[in-house]
Amino acid sequence: MGFLDNPTIILAHIRQSHVTSDDTGMCEVVLIDHDVDLEKIHPPSMPGDSGSEIQGSNGETQGYVYAQSVDITSSWDFGIRRRSNTAQRLERLRKERQNQIKCKNIQWKERNSKQSAQELKSLFEKKSLKEKPPNSGKQSILSVRLEQCPLQLNNPFNEYSKFDGKGHVGTTATKKIDVYLPLHSSQDRLLPMTVVTMASARVQDLIGLICWQYTSEGREPKLNDNVSAYCLHIAEDDGEVDTDFPPLDSNEPIHKFGFSTLALVEKYSSPGLTSKESLFVRINAAHGFSLIQVDNTKVTMKEILLKAVKRRKGSQKISGPQYRLEKQRQPNVAVDLESTLESQSAWEFCLVRENSSRADGVFEEDSQIDIATVQDMLSSHHYKSFKVSMIHRLRFTTELQLGISGDKVEIDPVTSQKASTKFWIKQKPISIDSDLLCACDLAEEKSPSHAIFKLTYLSNHDYKHLYFESDAATVNEIVLKVNYILESRASTARADYFAQKQRKLNRRTSFSFQKEKKSGQQ
């Protein structure tokens, strides 16, 4: 241990010791502010004055040279140590080594042995450019694929394939829908067909895409070439079609509807379509007749009898007297219920109660009906839509679409972009079953361009009346069509409505008769 009292030696020793050991540079900052050597060479002119500059003989300001280590510099980057030459050399060697790995050195050697012309010719052999005869025995993969998929070329719905979204999932907005096909065979109709469509497609485009995929997969039976022959209905998860709601509007975009399960249903009333042939059997009974619709002529007469009795009694339980069927031209001869309709060679029968006969007055109606009237009655069960306006008591009329078929009457409001529903109540769609219809009467006919009719139906044990207006021709067609449907369906609601109406009429007649009697006695 040595004791030193010379600040110059101590300062130099500390500077040299901290050149390689002080990474922070704080010692340099502390020691550079108090330089002993500089104070000895240039003592301050006044006490407490430690000037850092002196005036030269020529009057110029000269900077002092600090007596410090060469590694210590007075600059703003005093805390950063520069890399040594050794580190830079090692870094350069490392980069050269990496570059050598990427490069491959090939040593060029002169060819000593001379090769013959034959050997040189074999190295670069000349190829023959003659056209080869086509090999008819082997087909290309494209030809094989085209033969395996002939329906792709003859698919009448190819124009709708552009709405297929299977190749755009993740890049464009698409919608995945499970479509049930009630028109399919009994085994495959239980399984839905998954369709991925573009979100910008309309309902009509989606129907075309379904038909295109259906045809491409080779499903049976074949579809109609006209897309307008089909419509989309809301369906349950098990494939059951929800008939309480009307079909989706074909002009609306598909992203407007949030249904993930739909059903493709064929509509038979579109113009220009080959509709399925409807078979009707006429059952004459006391005070009227009924038209029973059948699918084919293979149906048994027992099924026709059950339908006729059920329609005659309505929603009541089939109990009480038993009935039998007789041919219209063969009275008192019962029809074999186990036989088919095809074996009977007749389309008109009589419903007769057991232990009775037509001679007893059970059936006395044998009127002839005009052929045109029968055709109108048969066509009345086909679906047809009309544009009418509903009349309200406390608000303006509402434009809607009235769809009439043999099973139900659908009332769908027509949404208009100009009409604002901000201050008015929006009309809800209504679906009325044909068994709940009671009457359809012409209320008023002012001119050929304006007429009003009233539709009466049963709702929650109460009779409701709806009033519609349109031109006279449309109103008369609607009234005639609905009345034909009501005549062919002997519903309980209609019978109860007329019975209640008759009771009210009798009470009014009795009240007026008693009033006249009292006035006559006075």
UniProtKB/Swiss-Prot annotation:
InterPro entries: CRIM_dom (IPR031567), PH-like_dom_sf (IPR011993), Sin1/Avo1 (IPR008828), Sin1_N (IPR032679), Sin1_PH_dom (IPR031313). It is a peripheral membrane protein. Present in the lumenal epithelium and glandular epithelium of endometrium (at protein level). GO terms for molecular function: enzyme-substrate adaptor activity; phosphatidylinositol-3,4,5-trisphosphate binding; phosphatidylinositol-4,5-bisphosphate binding. The modification Phosphothreonine is found at residues 86, 398. Phosphatidylinositol 3,4,5-trisphosphate (PI(3,4,5)P3) promotes MTOR activation by relieving MAPKAP1/SIN1-mediated inhibition of MTOR that takes place in absence of PI(3,4,5)P3. Transmembrane segments: none annotated. The modification Phosphoserine is found at residues 128, 186, 315, 356, 510. One of its GO terms (cellular component) is early endosome membrane. Keywords: Cell membrane, Cytoplasm, Cytoplasmic vesicle, Endoplasmic reticulum, Endosome, Golgi apparatus, Lysosome, Membrane, Mitochondrion, Mitochondrion outer membrane, Nucleus, Phosphoprotein. The keyword Phosphoprotein applies. Residues 279-353 are annotated as: SIN1-type RBD. Residues 468-522 are annotated as: Interaction with ATF2. The keyword Endoplasmic reticulum applies. Belongs to the SIN1 family. This is Target of rapamycin complex 2 subunit MAPKAP1. It comes from Ovis aries (Sheep). The lineage of its organism: Eukaryota, Metazoa, Chordata, Craniata, Vertebrata. The gene is MAPKAP1.
